[in-house]
């Protein structure tokens, strides 16, 4: 380990033996990572009751700048996925008429005055209908109210409220919202409005529902910060990746994490184990495991076969040979497949064990965190010492431990795919792969060693120490906390610049490293409202 990162005295520099438990039934650690709050958040949480206000804020902006009605503004925004900048760019480059046409809007054509008292509906083909039961859309097409109601009812019930087209053949015009509300029942109108409101989330690349289960009812709006992938924290406490909506997983890319979770959940490695440790009976094809040294295998179906080559044989044999049988030619392809299965199994086991070990540590350290915070608060109230009155050095160290432990756990799935052949087989030569692997593992090892030291020091009973020893512990913790933070930062820089940088990022963008942890979204509040921000510090 480099001298730059050995900044502790001997008492705090001893290595702790790793003793990770391996429980067959485990789940991800559900721990509070103390989400960061900021007055300049890169995300906002929009609660269910604020969705209308959030949508209205953008609608008003478009209505004022383009001089359009609310329903027209909403239709435009839905078509352009609520991307106001893109909408204004199309308006500037192509003009209003072209923009309207693409979105399914028409410039209103004044209705011609007619003296006819009765009219014909071209949908139901009814003649002699009174003009007052006929409704005309802005595109100019007119049909009877019963046909319109039937059309609207079907579309709303099918979930197509956001873009209900005119019934006329090949007409691409969107039906007026006010007309829809006027003709359908109040219950259906409420459902229609709910779909229009939810469109702000479901058709908006910058807003997504919180994936909490059960659903907390809130949505998260990402504020443009130059990063394609970000990790956010909802007010309900859930922290997740804004891009793929899974749990926070950096430094893994979304694709890496998806593949890793699937690999952990499915039976791919079980199949590898069976391939390595069993042979198929040549008669019934059931897998047989060898339990002793004899190469003559006997299946439950009664078939005898040779363990070495898998060929069917008779039962007469000695310890070293089978009567009337000699193994055939060297099965080169079969041996290669077996060796590959063994290699893949060993590799997966290596990375998964270390990934799981840090997850297990994270669970145990959650209990440690609670105990430490209780001690710090208790001492700040009972001891007249300045160091106890200001115990941010303890909470900072605990938060740093959790942030770095999570990063460490997910650095193993990253390494599994970064230096394997599944994703980047053709992106680098074997020599380049080995160089990059060594570079990453050196940084990973430095981070791992210092995180274990941090965990060990935090286990000390500082509430029993005298003032002088507490000050000494505070100095070491503060120093080590900064070291771990810097190592995390350097690991991310290595990944972004040295590992993924030379490769076209494509599907492998990662969320940026944030020294203070995943940022909690501030609460959206309409300008006219008097609410406060839950995420303000």
Swiss-Prot record:
PROSITE patterns recorded: TRIAD (PS51873), ZF_RING_2 (PS50089)
Task: Provide the taxonomic classification.
Answer: Eukaryota, Viridiplantae, Streptophyta, Embryophyta, Tracheophyta
Matching Gene3D superfamilies, A to Z? 1.20.120.1750, Zinc/RING finger domain, C3HC4 (zinc finger) (3.30.40.10)
Q: What is known of its domains?
A: Members of the RBR family are atypical E3 ligases. They interact with the E2 conjugating enzyme UBE2L3 and function like HECT-type E3 enzymes: they bind E2s via the first RING-type zinc finger, but require an obligate trans-thiolation step during the ubiquitin transfer, requiring a conserved active site Cys residue in the second RING-type zinc finger. The active site probably forms a thioester intermediate with ubiquitin taken from the active-site cysteine of the E2 before ultimately transferring it to a Lys residue on the substrate.
EC assignment: the record states: 2.3.2.31
Residues where Zn(2+) 1 binds: 121, 124, 144, 147
* Tissue specificity: Ubiquitous.
How is its cofactor bound, per UniProt?
Binds 4 Zn(2+) ions per subunit.
Q: Which SUPFAM superfamilies match?
A: RING/U-box
Q: What is this protein called?
A: Probable E3 ubiquitin-protein ligase ARI3
A Gene Ontology molecular function term for this protein is: zinc ion binding
Protein residues bound to Zn(2+) 6:
306, 309, 317, 327
């Amino acid at each position: 380990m480099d001298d730059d990162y050995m900044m502790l005295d001997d008492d705090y520099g001893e290595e702790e033996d790793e003793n990770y438990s391996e429980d067959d039934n485990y789940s991800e650690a559900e721990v509070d990572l103390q989400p960061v709050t900021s007055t300049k958040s890169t995300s906002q949480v929009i609660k269910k009751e604020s969705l209308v206000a959030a949508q209205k804020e953008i609608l008003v902006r478009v209505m004022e700048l383009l001089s359009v009605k609310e329903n027209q503004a909403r239709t435009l925004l839905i078509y352009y996925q609520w991307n106001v900048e893109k909408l204004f760019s199309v308006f500037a480059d192509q003009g209003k008429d072209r923009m309207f046409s693409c979105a399914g809007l028409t410039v209103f054509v004044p209705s011609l005055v007619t003296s006819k008292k009765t009219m014909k509906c071209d949908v139901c083909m009814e003649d002699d209908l009174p003009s007052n039961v006929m409704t005309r859309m802005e595109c100019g097409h007119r049909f009877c109210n019963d046909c319109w109601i039937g059309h609207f009812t079907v579309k709303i019930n099918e979930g197509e409220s956001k873009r209900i087209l005119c019934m006329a053949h090949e007409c691409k015009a969107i039906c007026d919202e006010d007309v829809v509300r006027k003709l359908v029942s109040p219950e259906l109108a409420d459902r229609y409005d709910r779909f229009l409101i939810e469109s702000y989330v479901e058709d908006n690349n910058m807003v997504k529902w919180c994936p909490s289960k059960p659903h907390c009812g809130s949505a998260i709006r990402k504020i443009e910060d130059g990063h394609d992938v970000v990790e956010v924290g909802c007010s309900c406490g859930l922290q997740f990746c804004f891009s793929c909506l899974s749990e926070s997983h950096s430094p893994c890319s979304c694709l890496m994490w998806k593949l890793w979770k699937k690999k952990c959940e499915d039976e791919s490695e079980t199949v590898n184990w069976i391939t390595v440790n069993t042979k198929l009976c040549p008669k019934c094809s059931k897998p047989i495991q060898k339990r002793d040294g004899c190469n003559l295998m006997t299946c439950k179906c009664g078939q005898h076969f040779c363990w070495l080559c898998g060929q069917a044989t008779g039962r007469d044999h000695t310890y070293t040979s089978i009567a009337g049988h000699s193994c055939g030619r060297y099965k080169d392809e079969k041996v290669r497949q077996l060796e590959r299965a063994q290699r893949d199994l060993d590799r997966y086991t290596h990375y998964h064990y270390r990934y799981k070990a840090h997850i297990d540590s994270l669970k145990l350290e959650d209990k440690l965190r609670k105990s430490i915070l209780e001690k710090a608060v208790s001492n700040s109230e009972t001891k007249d010492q300045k160091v106890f009155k200001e115990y941010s050095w303890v909470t900072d160290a605990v938060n740093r431990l959790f942030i770095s432990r999570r990063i460490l756990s997910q650095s193993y799935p990253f390494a599994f795919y970064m230096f394997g052949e599944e994703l980047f087989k053709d992106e680098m030569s074997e020599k380049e792969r080995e160089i990059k692997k060594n570079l990453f593992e050196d940084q990973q090892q430095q981070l791992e060693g210092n995180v274990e030291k941090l965990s060990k020091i935090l286990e000390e009973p500082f509430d029993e120490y005298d003032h002088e020893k507490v000050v000494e512990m505070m100095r070491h913790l503060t120093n080590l906390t900064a070291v771990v933070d810097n190592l995390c930062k350097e690991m991310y820089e290595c990944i972004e610049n040295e590992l993924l940088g030379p490769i076209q990022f494509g599907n492998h963008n990662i969320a940026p490293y944030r020294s203070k942890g995943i940022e909690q979204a501030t609460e959206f509040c309409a300008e006219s409202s008097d609410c406060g921000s839950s995420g303000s510090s």
